[in-house]
Amino acid sequence: MSETSEDEQTQLQTSDEEEDLGSEEEQEDEDNNHKEGDSEAALSGEDDKGSEDDAAEEQKLTWKDLGLNEALCQACDELKWKAPSKIQREAIPVALQGKDVIGLAETGSGKTGAFALPILHALLENPQRYFALVLTPTRELAFQIGEQFEALGSGIGIKCCVVVGGMDMVAQGLQLAKKPHIIIATPGRLVDHLENMKGFNLKAIKYLVMDEADRILNMDFEVELDKILKVLPRERRTFLFSATMTKKVKKLQRASLKDPVKVEVSNKYQTVEQLQQSYLFIPVKYKDVYLVHILNELAGNSFMIFCSTCNNTVKTALMLRALGLAAIPLHGQMSQNKRLAALNKFKAKNRSILISTDVASRGLDIPHVDVVVNFDIPTHSKDYIHRVGRTARAGRSGKAITLVSQYDIELYQRIEHLLGKQLTLYKCEEDEVMALQERVAEAQRTAKLELKDLEDTRGGHKRGGDTHDDSENFTGARKRMKPMGGTGGGGRKSFGKKNWSKGKQKR
């Protein structure tokens, strides 16, 4: 056991110089991979006919054709998974042959099913506790994967345990003591249990999955991964799934996989065809005004708005709620219970606008997002792919709008270079936008007061790591200002010009 781990640890921690090349190396990676993608597409002759052939193949193939157990085929039917997706068609047969798999696919392509179904198939053939370990970068993704395992295994008595930070360790320890079949964990909390929970080990694990592997490594979990790899048995199957293949992921592959089969069903930086991408060039001082204009123009849709900082999500949510819009924030400084509550309200359509940091840009399955707005342009161009991947999922159409200020031009050009195409300009009338300025300015002032009240009230708690409630406690703004356009809880009605003019009247 220790011999295995030393090899893995050595491979994972070699070539420090490679790690320190920084953003220039990453940009070079993007350039090279982009060129490779173009040449591969040209050589393979990918065109509309290829898409039609893929669609025809998808209609022909069934879950049974992939070699899955009948009980799992029935579970897929009950979940209304009509046919395997491209990544599932490619990865599942390879996994069922007992081979290690590297899966590269666009977000929203069904990666979870691609590793969950082979694991459950193997578990049915060889039932045992502590059968599989799934590592994920975020708590929300861990819970989502747990839900999918339980849904697929509901008819066969599968027991899962989700082990993440922000939750009670004692309760998690009790769950682990019951020896579940599947453990879904974030690396940091799993290491806590390995080091502190008497009698808990991973010596029996048959399957290791690293989902969103590039994100795990980008979040500086290398040390935790080393510790986990040290205690895993040599004889295991390993699945590595990622949206992108970086140098760090390649090193992890060498450290943890044996003769893997690479399954890649899309170009590295491809976005789905159903996604309409556009940009809007704006003065930074009127950023909030343009955002509100977009929400007004596209009223009736569900939105995910991405901000660069936790504080920005709170300020933007307060401002929108002051206008009567059903906005709810999601960021890394919220407690786990509040993060889950925010997600669940948005998924249940009780709130139509989710304002998030990049904590929610990867892996989460929120099927009804109609529009993604990049309020703050991402610093790393690859994060753009993951943000806009929240919409246009599972064959549905969607929109992505990026706000570009005078300070964001270089970052925006990197995104276009990465995509290999220019985005279209989102058309809007400046006069209509600026008609909202006074009302938005009033909402900004109200939001600023709200934020100060919250910080004053919760100053002590904030230092403890549990910041603003970010959802239901933003009531002061609504007391001071009348909501606009009767958006109510769902935010579905447009607050047109008539309502704006009413809002300007003295109260």
Swiss-Prot record:
SMART domains to which the protein is assigned, alphabetical: DEXDc, HELICc
Give an example GO biological process.
Answer: positive regulation of oxidative phosphorylation
Q: Where is this region: Disordered?
A: 1-58, 451-507
Q: Which residues bind ATP?
A: A105, E106, T107, G108, S109, G110, K111, T112
Q: Does the keyword Glycoprotein apply?
A: no
An example GO CC term for this entry is: nucleus
Q: Where is the composition biased (Acidic residues)?
A: 1-31
**Main subcellular location of this protein, as a coarse class:** nucleus
Q: Which residues form a coiled coil?
A: 426-453
Subcellular localization is given as: Nucleus, Nucleolus
**The protein's Enzyme Commission number:** 3.6.4.13
Give any GO molecular function from the UniProt entry: rRNA binding
Q: What does this protein do?
A: Part of a translational control module, also containing ath/DHX33 and ais/DDX52, which coordinates germline stem cell differentiation with ribosome biogenesis during oogenesis. This module allows for coregulation of ribosomal proteins and non1/GTPBP4, a p53 repressor, preventing p53 stabilization, cell cycle arrest and loss of stem cell differentiation. With atos, adjusts transcription and translation of a subset of OXPHOS genes in macrophages to increase mitochondrial bioenergetics and allow tissue invasion.
Tell me the protein family, please. Belongs to the DEAD box helicase family. DDX47/RRP3 subfamily.
Protein's UniProt name: ATP-dependent RNA helicase DDX47
Q: What is the source species?
A: Drosophila melanogaster (Fruit fly)
Give the gene symbol: pths
